[in-house]
Structure formats: C-alpha cells, structure tokens
Amino acid sequence: MLDLRKDPLVRPPHTGRRLAVAFCSLAVLLAPVAAHASAPAPAGQRGATVSAGTGLAQEKRLKSWGNNRSGQLGDGTWTDFRTTATTVLGLTSAEVVKIAAGGGGAANGHGLALLTDRTVQSWGANGSGQLGDGSVFSHNAPGQVVNLSDARDIAAGGWHSLALRDDGTVVAWGRNNYGQLGNGTHNDSSVPVRVEGLDKVTAVAAGLHHSLALREDGTVWAWGHNANGQLGDGTSAGRNVPAPVNGLTGVTRIAAGCDHNLALTGQPGDGADPTGGNAVKAWGHNATGQLGDNSTVNRYTPVDTQGIWLGGVAHIAAGCRHSLAVTDSDHKLKAWGQNTSGQLGDGTTDHRITPVPVPGLKGVQLLAGGREHTVALLGDGAVRSWGANGSGQLGNGTTTESSTPVTTLTALTGVDKIAAPVGGDFTFAN
C-alpha cells in the first residue's frame, strides 16, 4: 500500500503549507478510478517549462504559474512559487475542455480540469476534501475526482468545488461550513454530493464560501455564505440549500467573486444599453465598489452596474473584490472595484465605483480575476496580466506588480482557456 506520508506527490493535512488564510481571498464521474495517491505520474509527462515571452512547448500542455505552496500548480513540486509558466503533469491541451482555479489565501489553492472524456482531474490543497478524491491529503499532481463521469461544467471556490452533470443536476464537494455544498447539511465532504433541489442547470460558479447555478429558464440560484448579501435573496441569512436570486430572469452568464456576484442579462435597467442591449447585474459585497453601481453599499438584491453598456457586453468575470466586462462590439475591457495592486489595469491604484476602460487592450476574448490580479486572453492567443505579483502570478518572470497589462505568453501560442482563483494568486492557461 502506498504510504501517503512518503509519496512526493502527496502532502498530509495539517502541515504548515496548508494554513488556510480567510482574508477575502478566494473562476465529473462513475467508474473505478485511479485517485491522486495511486502512483506518481509516469516519466516523461512533466513537459518543458516555458519562460516569459516564449510560446508554449511543442507538445501543448496545460500551463500554470504563481503561488504553489499547496501544490496548486500541479507540476509535481512543492516549490513556493513560479514567475514563469510551468507544466501541469499529465494533461495535454487537447484533452482539457475547461479549467477552474480555487483558493482562499496564499497557502491554499486548488485546480480542476474537465476533460474530453467528461471526467474531472483535481490537484492542490485538500484539507477540506475540495479535490473530491475521498481523502484530505493535498496533491501536487492531477488525480481523478471520484464517482462522477458525466461533467459538462466545473467551478472552484475557496475550499469547495462544483460540477454540472449531463442531466442538469449539480454535485459539490469540499468545505461546507456555510452550506456551500447545498446538500442541506454543514458537513464537509471529500466526495461529490448532490446539491438539493436543482435541475435544468446550464452553468455553475463558486465564490469564496458560496455557490451559484444558472438554470435553463434564465434564473439564478444561490446557496452558502450570505453575510454580505451574496445570495441575492434580500437577507443576510446563509442557506444550505439553493434559493432563487430575487428578480433575475433572462440571465445568460454568471460570475462569482469572493463575496459578490455578476450576471449578464438582456433585461432593461439603468445600466443597460438604451438601444435594447444587455445589462450587467450585481449584488453582494461592495466595500470597494465592485458592484459598479456608483456606491460602496452592500446590495442584498441585484442592482444595475452603471455605464457598462457601450456596445453591449460579451463576457463578464469577477476577482475577489473587483469586476470585469468585455464589450461586445469591439472586445475592449472595462473594470471596476478594488484596485489596491493595480488589478483594474487603468494605470492607477484608485478604487473605482463605476466601470473604467483598461487602455491598450483590444480583441479581448476571455477574462479571469484572482485575489488582486487579472488575466486576459486576446484574440491572437496572447495572454496579458496585471495587478499583484508577489508570487509571480503575472507570469512575466518578475515579482513586481503592475497597474497596466504585461505580457505573460506571446501571441499565437494556441491558448484558448484561462483561469485564476478569486481568492488566490496563481494562474492557469491552456
């Protein structure tokens, strides 16, 4: 039998590396499976390390950079951090459908990858069972989530994870102190459990201690922590089963920050395109203006983000305390909320309570927000990032923060997916 205490890919719980820092720090398969602890990854799967400003390795693989104190980079090491891209062991780019990053502090982070065979791989911190492998041992290389074989979407929270199944139901695993697993209890689970009362779900999202689901009818359902109104039900009472967010219909996209949320909808509103385009709705924590409603007042039901409509909105994303949107007509970026480390990318460190443009970026296709950094994928496959960089999460070979975008990976690398944890300081690209 494998001795987990001696395996280099496995870290037992309760080591100093696993200290959970709850500062507002935060985007499946029924078969006999080989869990994380089965064996080290085969030789030759490590791949080549990529330096800043270079293309991906010839054999394209999932890449990671930034904090690695809990093995969240998945490269088979416990190296504290990496300032340039390394390779996640054993996962080729071609087999990865979606990636998700979770975490709630410098010493806590985990990753998820949805594969073409509909299974989910996980790695990193696991003190609350957030890897879903039936253990609470951290792992620095991917292993399979157990008892799920039909995933179509994934999300990673601070210490918990979610997966949407083919039948439209949702499963969750990991920490459950606030009911964020949605199964009617407050008991942690190291294996997937079904979220109660949800069907016909099309997408999921996870905050630091809460969860969201978008249903086919355009409604949004929420559960978990609610001290700042992040469940959007008009109260501050937590819920361990899902409940609808008040007044939201026609929603097409959702995003979760540490304690706030965004929804993209075609509903008219003060922040919507007067020509009939869509609107961004926001609710929850608002101390640094992350709701974009020209205030710093927490909102317990959705409000309109102001001045975002120019050309419509194509994509939304949330960091811990900041928010992001890409305009539909010209794929330019707007940002608002906390800007302590320059994560808004506007060349300042001033918080913004309404959206401001990020200069110098065109053709933005996807966005990801971390605790205090932001990542953008451009149409040519290039990755740009900005904000905090103390753990190398910008991937440009330094630990110097930047309030304007810097180059992480050059154009034409074939990248089409990015992820960052709303409560953490690392990044994935595939």
Where are these regions (language model features)?
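Eukaryote-biased RCC1-like beta-propeller repeat architecture
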Residues: 2-3, 8, 12-430
